[in-house]
Structure formats: C-alpha cells, structure tokens
C-alpha cells in the first residue's frame, strides 16, 4: 500500500514564525531595558565617583590661594567662631581656593562632627578645599609622653570620622610648632611618625602636612624626619610673616620694599624650594599676613598692597600655594561682606595675580 505524502500546513508554519518574531521582540525589549538601566547606573557612578587619592604634586597645584579661618574660635575656651554659608560663597567669589580650619579642642562630640562636616560640605559645594589643622597647644607647651599620646589619639578619632570624605580634604598635624616643642626636634619628629602611622590605618592615601620646628619657618625644614608611613602622600607646611611684616624687627622688616627687605622674602622662599627639590616633598605656605594687624596695625592699606603684591608674585613664581591670615581681618561676618577698605588688597592677592 502506498504511503500518503506529508501535508504542508501553511497556517502552522505562519504561526510558528509569528511566535518566534514576538519572542525576539520581547527579548530585545528586556535587553534594551537592561542596557538602559546599566547605562544610567554607570553614568550616576561616574558623576558621583571621587578619586581614591590625589598626588601631592596635583594637590599643590589645586590649593592655589586660600585663607585661614577661625570658625572654631581661637582657643579651647570657645568652640564657636564667626561662620556663615554666605561667607563661604563670598570667599569663593573672591577667588579663594582653600580654607584651613584651625581646631583647638581635644574633645569632639557627635554634634561637633556634625557641624564640622556641614562646614566641609559647604566648602566643597563652593569649590573650596578644606584643610583640617590641629592647634595642640597643651602639647606644644609641655611636649611630654602624656600630651604626645593625646595628640595621636585626637588624630586617630579625626581620621576615623573623616575616612570617607573626599581626598581633597587634607590633615595638617600641628599648627606652628611653637613654645617648648619648637626646639625639641626629636620629639616633634616622633609625634609626626606616630600620628601618620595612626592616620594611615584608616586613610592610607590622604594628604598629610607636617610642619618644621622653629615656628614653621622654612629654615627648620631640614630638621624634619619624613615619617615612614608617609607613602608618597605627605606634604610640608611652612610659613613666614604669619603675624605680618614689621618696621622694627630685622627678621621680617618691611618699610618701603627695599632690595634688602625683598631679599629676606626671596631667601626664605629659596630655602623651601631647594628643600622641596632635594626631598621631592611638596610644600604649602599655611599663613602669611599682609599687615601687622595684631601688633599695632602700623601699615597703611597702600603699604599692605605693596607688600602683598611682592609676596604673591614671589610665591607664584615658584608655584607655592599659600593661605593668608586670617578671615576676620578682612571679612565682616555681621554685615556679610568684605571690609571695604581691603577690597583692593584682596584683589591684588586673589584676583589680579591670577588673571
């Protein structure tokens, strides 16, 4: 008996093609959704990602010109100095690129950290780089083992609380080694060794500044022993004329800007620049003052502009960033504006020299 020939069912074939087509469309939709979702996630990550570290050379260039601020008072007796978000915005508008927080208090509460982080966030939102500096006055006055450990513990706690902050936030271990510790080089270097080792446990690549003995003068840089855990993310802070020039003190004399007076400034900068080249440790000037505001205010604004103009030119010449000392000398926090008489002075330092 002859077998029947197979019958081709066109309708079944058409239905099969249709189902296959629909399946591919659905798969494409799913893939499209996954792709869009992945791109959105990646875009958000790129937009919000922070670099894991900033090299000292790059950080030095980022700092440019800044100002020391007393938002946390001037001693352990008072944690509250003049501060406002409006002031931060005014600073940024003036061309200021970084601020140094000078902290004096050994006991930081959760509320204190909340306030500190709020100030840091406001700075970051306005493109101001925050530098956290510790005064450690009791240690400087009496640098014994007990005070040594208190400073190390302070930085341990600060580092733990700041470990997730942007790498733009840096640590300045001691504001001007003065009093007894200014001559105790071995103790100061020992403190730096211990503080850096402690900080590195939670902040392996955050920029840390160490300051030389002898009131942070550049001549003291040669006495610094670089901490073993510096690991390439260590810088040095030095300064001169932190309380302004003087018309009588030969060490920081400035009258009319004579060749001899200018040479004093050039000599100090050269000492720091030579040390920087020799050690490959980049530096920053943490404080200089255009006038002797704390010691009689003996300079006219015109004289201050002449001094500030030369200082700025010389530091700019070698790419050394700096902070002027200090905020409330130039900014009126009650009126929320720069003190009018210093407008040209500030422009000389922060704007005109950058143009």
Would you name each region that the model predicts?
Residues 50-98:
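N-terminal carbohydrate-binding accessory modules
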Residues 296-355:
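Aromatic-rich peripheral "rim/lid" segments of glycoside hydrolase catalytic domains that contact
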Residues 67-83, 103-107, 144-146, 245-264, ...:
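Acidic/histidine-rich helix-loop elements
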Residues 37-44:
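Bacterial N-terminal signal peptides
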Residues 85-138, 149-153, 157, 191, ...:
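Aromatic-lined substrate-binding rim segments of carbohydrate-active enzymes
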Residues 2-3, 28-34:
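Positively charged n-region of N-terminal signal peptides that target proteins for export
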Residues 152, 156-291, 310, 317-323:
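Active-site region of glycoside hydrolase catalytic domains
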